[in-house]
């Protein structure tokens, strides 16, 4: 059984990193309003207001 410990640690690290990635992606898309996603013109105006 001690031979499985590094493999288990690697699997745990991979699962934690995947959970963090999914949480980040979900938060990024949930913070955006749905109207800006459905209408690209408002999205472009918002991006221009941010960068210019």
From Swiss-Prot:
Signal peptide: none annotated. It is a single-pass membrane protein. Its main location: mitochondrion. It is found in: Mitochondrion membrane. The chain crosses the membrane at residues 6-26. One of its GO terms (biological process) is ATP biosynthetic process. One of its GO terms (cellular component) is proton-transporting ATP synthase complex. It comes from the Eukaryota. Keywords: ATP synthesis, CF(0), Hydrogen ion transport, Ion transport, Membrane, Mitochondrion, Transmembrane, Transmembrane helix, Transport. Belongs to the ATPase protein 8 family. Mitochondrial membrane ATP synthase (F(1)F(0) ATP synthase or Complex V) produces ATP from ADP in the presence of a proton gradient across the membrane which is generated by electron transport complexes of the respiratory chain. F-type ATPases consist of two structural domains, F(1) - containing the extramembraneous catalytic core and F(0) - containing the membrane proton channel, linked together by a central stalk and a peripheral stalk. During catalysis, ATP synthesis in the catalytic domain of F(1) is coupled via a rotary mechanism of the central stalk subunits to proton translocation. F-type ATPases have 2 components, CF(1) - the catalytic core - and CF(0) - the membrane proton channel. This is ATP synthase protein 8. It comes from Albinaria turrita. The lineage of its organism: Eukaryota, Metazoa, Spiralia, Lophotrochozoa, Mollusca.
